Amino acid sequence: MYSEWRSLHLVIQNDQGHTSVLHSYPESVGREVANAVVRPLGQALGHSPVSASQSLLYTDKDVKWTMEVICYGLTLPLDGETVKYCVDVYTDWIMALVLPKDSIPLPVIKEPNLYIQSILKHLQNLFVPRQEQGSSQIRLCLQVLRAIQKLARESSIMARETWEVLLLFLLQINDILLAPPTVQGGIAENLAEKLIGVLFEVWLLACTRCFPTPPYWKTAKEMVANWRHHPAVVEQWSKVICALTSRLLRFTYGPSFPPFKVPDEDANLIPPEMDNECIAQTWFRFLHMLSNPVDLSNPAVISSTPKFQEQFLNVSGMPQELSQYPCLKHLPQIFFRAMRGISCLVDAFLGISRPRSDSAPPTPVNRLSMPQSAAVNTTPPHNRRHRAVTVNKATMKTSTVTTAHTSKVQHQASSTSPLSSPNQTSSEPRPLPAPRRPKVNSILNLFGSWLFDAAFVHCKLHNGINRDSSMTASFIQILLSYKSSIATQASMEFRRKGSQMSTDTMVSNPVFDASEFPDNYEAGRAEACGTLCRIFCSKKTGEEILPAYLSSVILNSPPLFCCDLKGIDVVVPYFISALETILPDRELSKFKSYVNPTELRRSSINILLSLLPLPHHFGTVRSEVVLEGKFSNDDSSSYDKPITFLSLKLRLVNILIGALQTETDPNNTQMILGAMLNIVQDSALLEALGCQMEMGGGENNLKSHSRTNSGISSASGGSTEPTTPDSERPAQALLRDYGSTDSAAGLLIRSIHLVTQRLNSQWRQDMSISLAALELLSGLAKVKVMVDLGDRKRAISSVCSYIVYQCSRPAPLHSRDLHSMIVAAFQCLCVWLTEHPDMLDEKDCLKEVLEIVELGISGSKSKNSEQEVKYKGDKEPNPASMRVKDAAEATLTCIMQLLGAFPSPSGPASPCSLVNETTLIKYSRLPTINKHSFRYFVLDNSVILAMLEQPLGNEQNDFFPSVTVLVRGMSGRLAWAQQLCLLPRGAKANQKLFVPEPRPVPKNDVGFKYSVKHRPFPEEVDKIPFVKADLSIPDLHEIVTEELEERHEKLRSGMAQQIAYEMHLEQQSEGELQKRSFPDPVTDCKPPPPAQEFQTARLFLSHFGFLSLEALKEPANSRLPPHLIALDSTIPGFFDDIGYLDLLPCRPFDTVFIFYMKPGQKTNQEILKNVESSRNVQPHFLEFLLSLGWSVDVGRHPGWTGHVSTSWSINSCDDGEGSEQDEVTSSEDVGASIFNGQKKVLYYADALTEIAFVVPSPVESLTDSLESNISDQDSDSNMDLMPGILKQPPLTLELVPNHTDSLNSSQRLSPSSRMKKLPQGRPVPPLGPETRVSVVWVERYDDIENFPLSDLMTEISTGVETTANSSTSLRSTTLEKEVPVIFIHPLNTGLFRIKIQGATGKFNMVIPLVDGMIVSRRALGFLVRQTVINICRRKRLESDSYSPPHVRRKQKITDIVNKYRNKQLEPEFYTALFQEVGLKNCSS
């Protein structure tokens, strides 16, 4: 204000008017001269005060010489009468300007202004502190001050020069006494009130008669800033400024404005003749004369004045501590008095017509001389009971030495009802500010900077935002400090203990650092907070608050609704109105000159995140306090109707959607996306619980309210005209068609539309937003709400289009980050397909998805719109990257193997078959089966087939060829039990499969049998005549001789015997034939019996076409093995590697460690012990645990358990002993510690991931852990196929094993003993890199900083870290930073506040949970689980060393093929197929 004017400091310093010529002489000379000269003058005044004769001095020369002597006399010690005579003479002479007397020299009477100017300069010497005789000096100083006071009041001929000298004189004597540090009982302490009172009174008189020039105002302001460590300075300033304000309001706002009543004593300080213009000018200058009153809260600023710096070094040259200055201990009280004075001014401008009983400017209090109980009332404004009062102050009486200055406040009743505190129980109505009060902006322009900064005193920001020095303090810190000052009957504490307040009332405040916060400044801060609250609550309807203030409130208020402030929900509608002004506005042009628009939008979004759960949580609860319109004196009754929280839902949804449409900042956009999943899931769960009926009841109010209350902004200065389509506010104009988004289905559909539209337009270039949008779509796919097929198809099609665009980008733009976006899109596609498998029933959707898979694997589509179909064999594979190809292959596997098949009958814990070679051997009833009975083949270098040809002897039909095949591929281990079926199922039950059809019974009656002798030739032969030729052949008897006759006879006899024998046999045969049945089983034709022994492995391979010659040949120009190869299982280590392959999971696995932290806890042991009993934790914590997953038994669980030593076990003991033991121990209250991973864990799994939730707790003894380890090893004794090293005993450094008694208590109670179940240094499959997430339930939000994450690192071991290749020391230093932590703080409202640490990295924040978000009880478990899934997926995308599960399995299969391939020639291979296996090893 006076920056261009010079100060008068140099003029004062160079002025030598207070020196005398006698100062040049020795001290003895000056003393003697002064005593001799002054005594006659003083005695003349003392002996004849009434009839005083003429003065002894007649000429100007005499007077000037005498004044030189008196000037020196004023510097003498007070042990004599000389100084008193000097004071008497000068106080008599200065009355020449009031009423000339004979005792006054004639030259003085003739030129009083000239002489009195010199006298005033000489009187400065009196006020120089003496070492002794303090009471005498005080009496003399008061005499001079009274004379000065009378001079200023009664003189009418004082010239301007004299006024200026008088003002400088008063400034100098005040500076002499008040600028140095106050000495207890010193002259400054006793004269401070009178000194500053006379200065201000004379200054006001000067303003009336001779208005001071700007240099005087500037000098006064600079000097007053050096005296502020005196309570009287602030007290007198408060008196004067209140008196001036009372006069100012009287003519500024007219007689109808409520008068600001001040005590008559204070009102008399203002000269009656002071005109209105002078009052206005004087008021503004006096307002700033105290400089910034917030400096009173900073001892370093107050002690930086020159006088303090002079005394900062003591005589020995050693610096003193600031705490050694007792006067600085008064600063909290002085600060409070300054804020009280400003509070009174604000009340006056607001038109609160009656001052509060404790708001009048109080008198100074000497804390050193008064008892503590007499301390002033420092009740914060929030807790005051305001009564109608008129403040009258008793006259101040001043003592000489030890008189304490007190004041008496008399209260008089009034007929009106004044301002009451919000928590009062009386029926007094809340006072209304005056209708003609000034605007909020005007009041804030005057006092806002001071009040904001005062409310910000000793506050420490924890949100990392640097506040510009020109910005006002944050409204959230104001309200928080206000809350900390009024909590727990703080008013009674203030009344009893003054401004001292226990820090316990602010322990729960996250903004303040209790170790640095001086509790005795709370009174002043609370006064400023209350004043600001009254200012903002007095805003008129339709009044526009300047963007500078509105943006400051919003920018600094994100945690406002997260801190359990009582009654804070009353302001929810007004914050919603402010958000409706900011978030749908894309440019924010009117705020740009005050704040960063991006930061303003971010703060607004944070507030929105904290408001979204309120409508669902409070539902139809009505707000009984409706502030809007109450202070405007409007006749409109629309604001008087209580509104329900549920009616605010549509407004919040509209703001959310509008913010998404206008947001451009990536971080802000991700926060909005997280909020969308929050509101959609919460709505879905609420409707699923049957609450949609209640929601429907408030639907009419909801829609009508959104049109009335949203149409006019109470915070943005919008038009007060009725809402019309042309004059709608920006939010409604932008969101006019979103009326159906209040239901879960409507929210889901609109979210899908908005996100998919922007995913393929604005967001596809931004990786962070793209990942967040894909995570949102994945979360929306899991929301259990029925929506149309077209909307779901839109989401899938959008993701496919996104992948096409990213893959088609030019090669120079391809990078790892781009490929990470494509991989994330494939993962999102898998989520949608697994959650909605019926989508692939649509031909178009199936075609689009398979084309995208083809694009990812091969790099191009076979069919494009502009090209002919290009077949796979003709295409050259050129995927975007191997990561993209792997993701596409995983999607194809998901489509072919998981869709519609998850969860399997074996449960969601494992998508694989819970069968391996050991299981088949264990449950087979054939003693000849062992592990060598399996044939092992590999198909296409990617699938291992383990074939068991022998039937299992169970329900399989032994009459048919059967083969049991264990298929180990990239997607896991699957068991197929197959039989060769040639007949229908019904024919299998018929045992006459190979019996021919029955024949008819033959007829034995064959008719008559005739004996007919058959001729060799027909009879006609005998009738043919012979010819000569016939006679040429003689007859037999003609040529037979005797010898021949004998032979002939012999032959005839033999023939006869033969004929007889044959006839006998024929008869015998006919007899036997007649005795036989028909048909004859000997001769009957029958089918061959079925085969009983089969080489089913050869049949299986042959039937599937794997035994062709081409399949056994080495591919030309390739290092790949043939399509079919055999493995040699007799090579040592084969079954270890097979078990090693089975340990590789077939889907990602994550681990979450959950801790419970009670107030004040800092050590890991305290935190771990909390979960040992359900009585130690809040009931909502146990409910939260059960919402994360279901309980599983670690010993029988085939999935991930949180530690590699107990995970993926399929051959554990399955008898009833464990369950019986659990039943016995279940009666004990073990709380959440039952899920510590030793016996049980909480588990969640879907088709694409599995999560183990472990609640670490102290372990009773290491012996129990070792015993459980031994029992686990016994139960797994049949796991022949697990790696051999798994069956080794734990490696320790103990010389004598199994001696655990020597362990100290810390080792026996170490919760990390479960780590010792896994032998140190054991090689395990490359399961990493892993991401371990910690979830911490904190009862007190302040304890987040004390969470000992580094100490708990040993408790969150999963065994996977042993597979890391990096050194242990390196991992120990970086591991803590790699662990994301989700803090959950339960609020008193039943909602939950979220704090996330360590979840940001290369890919920025992870949704849906966002730092600062408020979550409902229903959606907490789902959102935490979804956030964990997204965090771990992000970490895997970020890791360079991560490989998908199917890739790791494929690599291991390739390794097994290379190590155990049976390199046989084709003949040898075929020969081996016909050989039996396993028989030779039956005994092994």
Swiss-Prot record:
Location of Phosphothreonine modifications: T363, T379, T724
Tissues of expression: Detected in brain, thymus, lung, heart, spleen, liver and testis (at protein level).
Top-rank taxon: Eukaryota
Record field: compositional bias (Polar residues): 369-381, 392-428, 701-725
GO biological process entries: activation of GTPase activity; Ral protein signal transduction; regulation of exocyst localization; regulation of protein localization; regulation of small GTPase mediated signal transduction
GO molecular function (one): protein heterodimerization activity
Keyword terms, alphabetized: GTPase activation, Phosphoprotein
Pfam family name, one: RALGAPB_N
Rap-GAP domain mapped to chain residues: 1138-1382
Subunit structure: Component of the heterodimeric RalGAP1 complex with RALGAPA1 and of the heterodimeric RalGAP2 complex with RALGAPA2. Heterodimerization is required for activity.
Protein's name according to its UniProt entry: Ral GTPase-activating protein subunit beta
